[in-house]
């Protein structure tokens, strides 16, 4: 401490000796250091504005001020006014006029906070006019302009008490510039910007002639308490008004937005919902474990009671009771439907060619509607509901403010470039990333200039289209040149000029001389982007060549805090005007973007060794979606081909090599596929007639889906026909009819359930999904109808061909000498009968299976609670898309989120004082105004998702009107008398301000408001008036023809939004904020009750659906269960137990699917919702056939009926449902589109696997325990039919093979179970007929 004090004394002595021999020998109260003006500073030239005159050296007593001089002093420097008789000053009238003029520039920025503005003025008033000037001012350098004249002061020292300086700085440190959404001190602190600014640096910048505004150099010394100065000098310690205090009765304190001390106590938003725990276990997990345990226990109890009940029944069974009325009712629907379809099938099989012709005519008639098809490719039209709130908001925004401009953006990182250190003269040692290398910047500048000068020929316009024809030009929208185009990049700090980029200069600072170059200028501009002239020896501007600042978060990315030199990526953004779809300029914009993409692809290839580049144009997303759709068409075609091949091969019943050509079902398989495709085309044509738009996704996916569903019915029908023996004397047509009567109710059950599920899925508001659901539902109905007609006719013709031993495909030839087919059951049926079913339904296996599936259900219930909701837009792209890298870079490097506009509708009066105060955020405004509420929200970005407070045209309009600035003036004479005079006009014709000076905040009258607002909106901002509204607010206020405001907007920024969950939550939070603002503004007198404030972000239309997709999904899926249960209940013969077990299996499939979606990275959204609706429909295929087979079986026990259903219908379901789905689904894994891979390949694979497991493993076990009792009505009918058949049995012997003894023509009796003694089939005792075909 002693050493420090000795050092201070030594410094004071040296300073005192230096002062003694310089220009201010007298330091005492009442003495000046300089007085009067001595012209311009000869050492300076090229200031940003006309620099003020410098003062004359004059160490003389202060002058007594009177008259006009006193009045001027009182107006300019009110704190130096001591009354009419006791006011002294060290400045002349000329000096006061110059001081007032020079302060007007800064006051334009600070006037919104009166305390700050007055404190700032007070500092410079004391320096220039204080009567005690010599106490704290010491001149250090003068120049002699002319002999005989007083020397002119070009440099001096000012000594302040540190507390005085820091209080003054503190009062200004939070004052904002609304248009730039930044702090005013950021442009008043030089290279340090707002982040590194403090009182010393703030004052140093004001005294630095290098800033282009200061007329002389001032060195500020801030002294701690107790530090003394020699020769009677005393540091200035004047009055400072805190920002939260007013200047007087008519003045207002600074607002919360400009002064932290003025802020009311804002309770922090509620913390993120804490996790729910029960003890140390997550609450949901604990609840699900309890639920699963109860479910398992209940199942065990039910099984036990059921087994015990069966044992009691077996002990008391003595006679066969007649079917009671409920059982007859249960049997009635089965009988009615069976007889109807049997009759129908017989008639169709009897007239196959007629039915085929009629079916073909109907399909063609409906397909003609495809000529009217409208394919939707616009992502907005595909993925957002036309009547959704977001679409309405978008329509309002586009109508009143124009569409959000089209963004063409480039991210660039350096390959194999390590970071390096740079010792900056201004900021000391700084780390620079590899991308910030001069040679790379030069190459990127060449790229940027090539893109800026890019031209492309338009055949429609018959001329070249260039960037200036379509670009967004905020400062010159009507007569745009190339340099007016908004291009944001780091290179704009050098005005896109190679020469300026290479510029170097020697600079001395604090006694150290060093070379400064582009790196110093970059550091300066990144910290102070509003700078018109940096403080380096380069003296370069930071303003882009189109006239606006480039903020660092839009030019560089991948940095921490404010370490911009460590940025890993450079960002180049071309902003292009957006136009309506029918505007010719939209085609021009897309044409230029196409050329932009080609240039970028070429540059990416040629510089792959230097740069890693990601880029995007506005048209890119739509282009890539369309590209992948076309690319994946062959994948879908192969999928259809494989399913067709499988059907063709699997439908055949092969017994001998010599009969392969005859027993093949290629034609029948092709016909089945044609039936499916015909149903799809007919459905699409039908909706085209109605004007319902379609999409490429429908063309891809719906045929595949309907083929998978339709192939199931084809298999079940054909296999049943092959297995069902022909009755004695039964014609082929009757045989087909009887087969159809047996399986058609089951086909109807599945098709109807699936179609209803799809139609319910159309309740979603997403257009693409809605159209997909409608088309799929109708296609399934048409598919069922065509299967009941065209396919039955095809089977009739194919059976006739096979029975005539004609080869498939080339049926014109006949093979008469072929041996008859062998009677055998087939490998699949054999496997199910001998191996699978006995193992599955073993007494020890069944409880294990039941327990495992219940545990799996419980586990997936928990996983279901953790599924992510949303759809990231990159999933709509192919895996090889260049946009994948773009979205990756966007999320990794962009340090700010998208802009969010708070739009106001008509019905609010902005022109009243109350109306303005409820909107603005400067002095005199309400504490909970619109902009203040957004400011409060921005202080909690993790909850509000707002990171940067809103710009406000109301605030800047008020500041623009302030008389102390040079912004709003009126011509007092000349040809433009009484018209607006721009701040660039310095003539004496513009001496009248728009508003008179007031003691309180400036507020225009209603008449003044409507008169001056258009002037403000068309005023170009410049150094003399930075508040001009042309650049920032030209499109922010929509005026009617009579000047009334019908819409306005206030722009803020979200925090970085990385995924769809962030976008969804940001939309939710901004709507809550807007609703709160709306409720507050409706309290302002004169406000329309329908007035509204709403948030608009360009992405809202895509993420609106995710606000409600969860409850909508639960409702839709729950709704799907109702018709599924009802249809099953009705078509299974009013069997409620079968319906419940059927529904239970479907619910378990659905829950397991959703749970495993979370494991496999499949998010929940509208696309997955429609697939889950499909899952309900497809689950019906897996379980309903087996449930119905169990219900109509006449075996005496549940276990035997379960075995019977598993062997016969289970094998058919495996061959017809699972095996027709698997090949097509697996092929989808090769699709390029991630949307197809994730939401159709993965999800449908899960659905098929889980459906297969539940249908062929879980359901038979459950039915063996809890299935319904045997239907005695069916038992009775079977008994009567058997007795009738035995009575009519012919006496002629049977042939050992189903062939005519003389001609050997094949007779299709189907598969005869009498050759398999192990199966006690009801039909095994039926006699055979020698009917030949």
UniProtKB/Swiss-Prot annotation:
Matches recorded under InterPro entries: HMGCR/SNAP/NPC1-like_SSD (IPR053958), NPC1-like (IPR004765), NPC1_MLD (IPR053956), NPC1_N (IPR032190), SSD (IPR000731)
Membrane topology term: Multi-pass membrane protein
Originating species: Mus musculus
Keyword Glycoprotein among UniProt keywords: yes
Signal peptide: 1-20
Gene3D superfamilies per UniProt: Multidrug efflux transporter AcrB transmembrane domain
Stated name of the protein: NPC1-like intracellular cholesterol transporter 1
UniProt-listed PROSITE patterns: SSD
SUPFAM superfamilies referenced in this protein's UniProt entry, alphabetically: Multidrug efflux transporter AcrB transmembrane domain
Disulfide bonds: 32-90, 38-56, 77-125, 91-129, 113-254, 116-172, 189-197, 243-259, 256-263, 471-485, 525-542, 920-925, 967-1025, 981-990
Post-translational modification comment from the UniProt entry: Highly glycosylated.
GO MF terms held by the record: lipid transporter activity; protein homodimerization activity
Subunit and partners: Interacts with RAB11A, MYO5B and RAB11FIP2. Interaction with RAB11A, MYO5B and RAB11FIP2 is required for proper transport to the plasma membrane upon cholesterol depletion. Interacts with NPC2. Interacts with LIMA1.
Residues annotated as domain SSD: 632-797
Pfam family, one: NPC1_MLD
Tissue: Expressed in small intestine, stomach and muscle, along with detectable expression in lung, heart, gall bladder, brain, testis, skin and liver. Expression in liver is extremely low.
Residues in coiled coil: none
């Amino acid at each position: 401490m002693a050493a420090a004090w000795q050092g201070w004394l030594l410094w004071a002595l040296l300073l005192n000796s230096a002062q003694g021999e310089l220009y201010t020998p007298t330091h005492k109260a009442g003495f000046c250091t300089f007085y009067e003006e001595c012209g311009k500073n000869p050492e300076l030239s090229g200031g940003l504005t006309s620099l003020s005159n410098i003062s004359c050296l004059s160490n003389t007593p202060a002058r007594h001020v009177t008259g006009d001089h006193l009045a001027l002093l009182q107006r300019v420097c009110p704190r130096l006014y001591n009354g009419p008789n006791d006011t002294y000053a060290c400045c002349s009238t000329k000096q006061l006029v110059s001081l007032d003029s020079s302060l007007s520039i800064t006051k334009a920025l600070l006037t919104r906070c009166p305390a700050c503005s007055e404190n700032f003025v007070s500092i410079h008033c004391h320096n220039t006019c204080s009567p005690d000037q010599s106490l704290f001012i010491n001149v250090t350098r003068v120049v002699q302009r002319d002999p005989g004249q007083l020397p002119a002061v070009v440099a001096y020292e000012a000594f302040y008490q540190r507390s005085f300086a820091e209080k003054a700085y503190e009062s200004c440190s939070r004052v904002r510039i609304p248009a730039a959404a930044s702090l005013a001190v950021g442009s008043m602190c030089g290279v340090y910007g707002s982040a590194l600014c403090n009182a010393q640096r703030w004052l140093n910048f004001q005294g630095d002639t290098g800033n282009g505004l200061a007329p002389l150099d001032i060195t500020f010394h801030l002294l701690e308490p107790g530090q003394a100065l020699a020769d009677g000098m005393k540091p200035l310690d004047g009055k400072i008004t805190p920002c939260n205090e007013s200047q007087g009765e008519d003045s207002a304190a600074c607002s919360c937005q400009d002064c932290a001390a003025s802020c009311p106590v804002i309770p922090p938003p509620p913390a993120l919902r804490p996790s729910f725990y029960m003890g140390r276990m997550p609450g949901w997990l604990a609840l699900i474990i309890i639920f699963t345990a109860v479910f398992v226990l209940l199942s065990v109890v039910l099984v036990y009671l059921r087994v015990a009940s069966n044992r009691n029944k077996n002990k008391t069974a003595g006679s066969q009771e007649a079917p009671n009325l409920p059982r007859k009712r249960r049997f009635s629907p089965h009988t009615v439907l069976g007889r109807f379809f049997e009759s129908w099938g017989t008639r169709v099989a009897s007239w196959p060619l007629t039915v085929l012709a009629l079916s073909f005519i109907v399909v063609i008639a409906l397909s003609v509607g495809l000529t009217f098809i409208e394919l939707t490719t616009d992502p907005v039209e595909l993925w957002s509901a036309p009547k959704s709130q977001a679409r309405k908001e978008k329509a309002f925004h586009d109508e009143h403010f124009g569409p959000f401009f089209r963004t063409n953006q480039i991210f660039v990182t350096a390959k194999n470039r390590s970071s390096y250190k740079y010792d900056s003269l201004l900021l000391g040692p700084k780390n620079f990333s590899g991308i910030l290398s001069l040679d790379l910047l030069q190459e990127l500048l060449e790229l940027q200039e090539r893109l800026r000068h890019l031209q492309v020929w338009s055949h429609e316009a018959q001329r070249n289209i260039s960037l200036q024809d379509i670009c967004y030009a905020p400062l010159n929208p009507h007569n745009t040149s190339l340099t007016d185009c908004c291009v944001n990049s780091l290179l704009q700090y050098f005005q896109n000029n190679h020469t300026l980029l290479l510029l170097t200069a020697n600079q001395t600072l604090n006694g150290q001389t060093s070379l400064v170059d582009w790196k110093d200028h970059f550091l300066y501009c990144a910290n102070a982007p509003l700078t018109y002239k940096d403080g380096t020896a380069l003296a370069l501007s930071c303003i882009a060549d189109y006239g606006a600042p480039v903020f660092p978060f839009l030019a560089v990315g991948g940095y921490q805090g404010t370490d911009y030199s460590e940025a890993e990526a450079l960002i180049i953004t071309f902003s292009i005007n957006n136009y309506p779809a029918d505007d010719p300029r939209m085609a021009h914009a897309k044409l230029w973007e196409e050329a932009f993409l080609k240039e970028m692809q070429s540059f990416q290839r040629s510089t792959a060794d230097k740069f890693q580049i990601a880029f995007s144009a506005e048209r890119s997303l739509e282009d890539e979606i369309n590209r992948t759709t076309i690319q994946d068409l062959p994948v879908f075609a192969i999928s259809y081909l494989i399913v067709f091949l499988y059907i063709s091969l699997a439908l055949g019943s092969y017994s001998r090599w010599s009969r392969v050509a005859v027993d093949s079902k290629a034609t029948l398989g092709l016909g089945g596929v044609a039936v499916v495709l015909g149903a799809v085309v007919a459905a699409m044509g039908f909706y085209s007639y109605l004007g319902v738009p379609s999409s490429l996704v429908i063309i891809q996916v719906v045929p595949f889906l309907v083929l998978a569903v339709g192939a199931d019915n084809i298999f079940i029908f054909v296999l049943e026909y092959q297995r069902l023996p022909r009755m004695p004397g039964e014609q082929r047509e009757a045989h087909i009819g009887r087969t159809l009567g047996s399986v058609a109710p089951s086909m109807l059950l599945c098709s109807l359930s699936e179609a209803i599920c799809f139609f319910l899925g159309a309740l979603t508001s997403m257009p693409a999904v809605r159209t997909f659901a409608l088309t799929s539902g109708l296609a399934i109905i048409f598919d069922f109808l065509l299967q009941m007609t065209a396919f039955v006719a095809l089977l009739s013709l194919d059976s006739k061909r096979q029975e005539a031993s004609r080869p498939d495909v080339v049926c014109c030839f006949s093979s008469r000498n072929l041996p008859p087919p062998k009677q055998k059951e087939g490998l699949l049926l054999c496997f199910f009968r001998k191996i699978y079913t006995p193992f599955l339904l073993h007494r020890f296996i069944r409880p294990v299976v039941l327990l495992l599936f219940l545990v799996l259900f419980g586990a997936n219930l928990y996983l279901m609670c953790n599924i992510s909701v949303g759809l990231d837009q990159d999933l709509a792209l192919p895996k090889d898309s260049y946009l994948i890298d773009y979205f990756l870079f966007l999320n990794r490097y962009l340090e700010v989120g998208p802009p969010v506009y708070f739009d106001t509708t008509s019905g609010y009066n902005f022109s009243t004082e109350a109306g303005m105060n409820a909107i603005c955020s400067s002095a005199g405004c309400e504490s909970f105004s619109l902009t203040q509420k957004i400011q409060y929200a921005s202080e909690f970005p993790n909850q509000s998702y707002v990171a940067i407070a809103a710009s406000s045209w109301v605030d800047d309009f008020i500041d623009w009107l302030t008389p102390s600035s040079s912004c709003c003036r009126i011509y007092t004479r000349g040809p433009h008398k009484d018209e607006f005079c721009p701040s660039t006009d310095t003539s004496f014709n513009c001496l009248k301000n728009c508003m008179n000076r007031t003691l309180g905040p400036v507020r225009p009258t209603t008449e003044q408001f409507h008169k001056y607002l258009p002037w403000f909106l068309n005023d170009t901002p410049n150094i003399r008036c930075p508040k001009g509204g042309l650049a920032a607010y030209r499109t922010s206020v929509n005026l009617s023809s009579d000047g009334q405001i019908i819409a306005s907007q206030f722009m803020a920024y979200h925090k970085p939004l990385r995924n769809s969950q962030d976008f969804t939550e940001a939309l939710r939070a901004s709507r809550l904020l807007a609703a709160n603002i709306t409720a507050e503004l409706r309290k302002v007198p004169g406000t329309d009750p329908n007035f509204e404030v709403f948030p608009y972000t360009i992405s809202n239309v895509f993420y609106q659906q995710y606000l409600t997709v969860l409850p909508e999904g639960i409702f839709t899926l729950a709704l799907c269960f109702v018709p599924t249960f009802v249809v099953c209940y009705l078509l299974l013969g009013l069997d409620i137990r079968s319906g419940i077990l059927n529904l239970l299996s479907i619910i378990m499939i659905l829950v397991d699917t959703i749970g495993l979606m979370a494991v496999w990275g499949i998010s929940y959204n509208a696309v997955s919702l429609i697939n889950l609706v499909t899952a309900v429909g497809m689950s019906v295929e897996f379980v309903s056939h087996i449930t119905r087979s169990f219900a109509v079986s006449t075996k005496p026990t549940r276990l035997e009926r379960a075995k019977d259903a598993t062997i016969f219908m289970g094998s058919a379901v495996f061959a017809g449902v699972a095996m027709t789905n698997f090949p097509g689904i697996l092929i989808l894994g090769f699709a390029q589109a991630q949307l197809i891979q994730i939401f159709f390949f993965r999800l449908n694979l899960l659905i098929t696997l889980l459906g297969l497991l539940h249908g062929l493993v879980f359901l038979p076990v459950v039915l063996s325990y809890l299935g319904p009792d045997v239907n005695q009505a069916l038992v009775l009918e079977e008994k009567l039919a058997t007795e009738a058949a035995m009575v009519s049995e012919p006496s002629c012997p049977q042939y050992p093979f189903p062939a005519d003894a003389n001609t050997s023509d094949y007779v299709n009796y189907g598969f005869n179970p009498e050759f398999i003694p192990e199966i006690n089939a009801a039909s095994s005792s039926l006699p055979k007929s020698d009917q030949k075909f």
